[in-house]
C-alpha cells in the first residue's frame, strides 16, 4: 500500500515579491509614436526588436500590438534578405 507524504509549504522556493509588484507596464512604441507603417530601412528601430541570438522578440515581451508585430516581422525579414540586419549572432555586420 502506498504512503502519502505531506506537502510542506516551507520547502517551496520563495518568489521575489518585489519583482511581482513592480512589473513594468508594456506599451506599443509604434502606437505612441503614431507610426502608420514600419519601414525595413529603419535598421536602428528593427534592432531593438531582435534578440542577441538573431531571433525576433515576440509581442508578449515587447508589448507591440498585433498589427505592428506583423509589419515588424515582415520588415525584419526584408532587411535580413537585403543584408541590412544579420540573420543570426554569428553574422556580424
Curated annotation (Swiss-Prot):
One of its GO terms (molecular function) is small ribosomal subunit rRNA binding. One of its GO terms (cellular component) is cytosolic small ribosomal subunit. The keyword Ribonucleoprotein applies. InterPro entries: Ribosomal_bS18, Ribosomal_bS18_sf. It holds the Pfam family Ribosomal_S18. Keywords: Ribonucleoprotein, Ribosomal protein, RNA-binding, rRNA-binding. The keyword Ribonucleoprotein applies. It comes from the Bacteria. One of its GO terms (biological process) is translation. Belongs to the bacterial ribosomal protein bS18 family. Part of the 30S ribosomal subunit. Forms a tight heterodimer with protein bS6. PANTHER family: 30S RIBOSOMAL PROTEIN S18 (PTHR13479), SMALL RIBOSOMAL SUBUNIT PROTEIN BS18M (PTHR13479:SF40). Binds as a heterodimer with protein bS6 to the central domain of the 16S rRNA, where it helps stabilize the platform of the 30S subunit. This is Small ribosomal subunit protein bS18. It comes from Paracidovorax citrulli (strain AAC00-1). The gene is rpsR.
Amino acid at each position: 500500500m502506498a504512503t502519502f507524504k505531506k506537502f510542506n509549504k516551507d520547502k517551496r522556493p520563495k518568489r521575489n515579491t518585489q519583482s511581482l509588484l513592480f512589473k513594468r507596464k508594456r506599451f506599443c512604441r509604434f502606437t505612441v509614436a503614431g507610426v502608420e507603417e514600419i519601414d525595413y530601412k529603419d535598421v536602428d528601430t528593427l534592432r531593438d526588436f531582435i534578440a542577441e541570438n538573431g531571433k525576433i522578440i515576440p509581442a508578449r515581451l515587447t508589448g507591440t500590438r498585433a498589427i505592428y508585430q506583423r509589419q515588424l516581422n515582415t520588415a525584419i525579414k526584408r532587411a535580413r534578405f537585403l543584408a541590412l540586419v544579420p540573420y543570426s549572432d554569428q553574422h556580424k555586420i
